[in-house]
């Protein structure tokens, strides 16, 4: 019952949230904002338990960074991670762009030797960018995009096809997400008017089955988008004290198409 937000936009659908934060690479995150409780239900029915807001990195200065780590679990399984970040900002701060890329690979881990994995096989590639342009001193246009290509599998008999095993959970995700926003400030930055739109498309091929079930293959397409506008005004005195006034309008849409041919299931 927690909603994941990307830069305050609820574009992470219930389907994308199945594996949740594990599909978001660390090197794209600037900070994480957590709101607990039903007060966050303004973002929708998925948020009655709270929200997790992922704020991605903004270009601040010219920089480049590459990192790589290797980890081992009980001397059995290796996990590899590689990440790269780069940012470029103009001298007058008129425009800037931040790029990131990450790669993660993990072999299946069987902790108790029963032949079934406690941690599944994982292979994930992610690329993204965030850029801005300031047409004037009091306006800003921002654009962001990121894509994730992920394969994961858990169960047993990893050398066989999923329908030849005792039990397998296997998914392949291709996720594309982007957003565009325009911010207009008044002088002294006491008032702000924003227009924004964000979209995310998920394409998933899956297998959830046991006992050599050849019918358990599925294919799912999911599209989520949101668009809206917001005004924020700061006033030095309203009646007897300073005040902030916020107003906005937002529209959200989520469409899902799930097909399992073996079970003659076609849901929209």
Question: What positions do the PLM features span?
Answer:
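Short acidic/polar hinge/loop motifs at secondary-structure boundaries
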Residues: 2, 9-36
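Outer-membrane beta-barrel translocator/receptor signature
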Residues: 13-15, 28-30, 41-53, 57-112, ...
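Short loop/turn motifs that connect adjacent beta-strands in outer-membrane beta-barrel proteins
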Residues: 59-63, 90-94, 137-140, 186-192, ...
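Membrane-embedded beta-strand positions of outer-membrane beta-barrel proteins
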Residues: 64-68, 97-101, 129-131, 143-145, ...
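Transmembrane beta-strands of outer-membrane beta-barrel pores
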Residues: 70-74, 90-92, 103-107, 147-151, ...
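Residues on the lipid-exposed face of transmembrane beta-strands in outer-membrane beta-barrel proteins
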Residues: 82-88, 129-133, 180-184, 227-233
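Flexible loop and strand-edge segments within Gram-negative outer membrane beta-barrel domains
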Residues: 106-126, 132-134, 138-193, 199-223
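Outer-membrane beta-barrel transmembrane domain signature of Gram-negative proteins
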Residues: 171-174, 199, 203-268
């Amino acid at each position: 019952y927690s909603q994941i937000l990307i830069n305050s936009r609820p574009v992470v659908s219930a389907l994308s949230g199945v594996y949740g934060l594990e599909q978001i690479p660390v090197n794209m995150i600037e900070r994480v904002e957590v709101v607990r409780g039903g007060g966050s239900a303004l973002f929708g029915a998925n948020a009655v338990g709270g929200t997790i807001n992922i704020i991605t990195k903004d270009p601040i200065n010219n920089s480049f960074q590459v990192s790589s780590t290797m980890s081992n679990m009980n001397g059995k399984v290796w996990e590899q991670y590689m990440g790269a970040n780069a940012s470029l900002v103009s001298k007058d701060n008129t425009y800037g762009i931040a790029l990131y890329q990450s790669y993660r690979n993990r072999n299946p881990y069987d902790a108790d030797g029963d032949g079934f994995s406690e941690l599944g096989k994982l292979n994930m590639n992610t690329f993204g960018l965030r850029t801005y342009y300031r047409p004037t001193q009091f306006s800003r246009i921002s654009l962001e995009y990121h894509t994730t290509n992920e394969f994961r599998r858990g169960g047993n008999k990893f050398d066989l096809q999923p329908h030849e095993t005792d039990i397998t959970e296997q998914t392949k995700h291709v996720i594309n997400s982007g957003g565009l926003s325009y911010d207009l400030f008044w002088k002294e930055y006491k008032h702000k008017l924003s227009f924004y739109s964000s979209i995310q498309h998920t394409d998933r091929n899956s297998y959830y089955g046991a006992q050599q079930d050849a019918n358990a293959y599925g294919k799912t397409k999911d599209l989520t988008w949101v668009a809206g506008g917001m005004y924020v005004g700061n006033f030095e005195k309203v009646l007897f004290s300073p005040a902030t006034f916020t107003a906005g309008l937002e529209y959200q849409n989520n469409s899902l198409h799930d097909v399992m041919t073996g079970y003659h299931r076609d849901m929209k």
